[in-house]
Regions:
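Juxtamembrane/disordered regions of integral membrane proteins
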Residues: 1-92, 96-159
């Protein structure tokens, strides 16, 4: 059952990203490295205020939906009520999501799809190297230790 739940959680993650870039990859310019963002703004593909507004309009609902889904999966679907049980489940989900984001989203989808290539920036290096992915995912792995404690606390309080 946990594998099905992890798959659902990762598909929800993907769906949220896909919705954010409806109309083209430029709508998700905030996902790109700063140098690519700056160059896209110079080319007039988007302005910085619009990009920042789109980032905020994505990130706030994204975090709310992903947090709510995680709390409901752990507390309601799995019936976890103790902090410890909820913490370990949250840590598993967050770490799997972290790896999924780095490998499936960043390396496979972004790295092998023409969708993410911006007009006028065809030669811009926007796909992370394996070294960059490992560094970012290692840092996030530590952050998710604390994030799992927050989720565990919420589940314990609600359920």
């Amino acid at each position: 059952m946990i594998v099905l739940q992890l798959l659902f959680y990762c598909l929800l993650f993907t769906a949220m990203v896909k919705i954010a870039v409806i109309g083209g990859a430029v709508n998700g310019l905030y996902f790109y490295p700063k140098e690519v963002q700056d160059h896209a703004i110079e080319l007039g593909l988007i302005d910085r205020n619009t990009m920042n507004r789109k980032r905020k309009c994505f990130m706030i609902p994204f975090f709310i939906v992903m947090l709510a889904a995680l709390v409901l999966i752990i507390g309601l679907w799995n019936g976890a009520s103790s902090f410890g049980e909820a913490y370990w489940q949250a840590l598993l989900f967050l770490e799997v999501m972290n790896i999924y984001d780095g490998v499936v989203i960043d390396k496979l989808w972004v790295g092998h799809s023409q969708f993410w290539v911006l007009p006028g920036l065809e030669d811009a290096p926007f796909v992370q190297t394996w070294r960059q992915v490992l560094k970012k995912r290692s840092i996030l792995a530590l952050i998710w230790v604390a994030g799992a404690a927050i989720v565990g606390g919420i589940v314990h309080l609600i359920f």
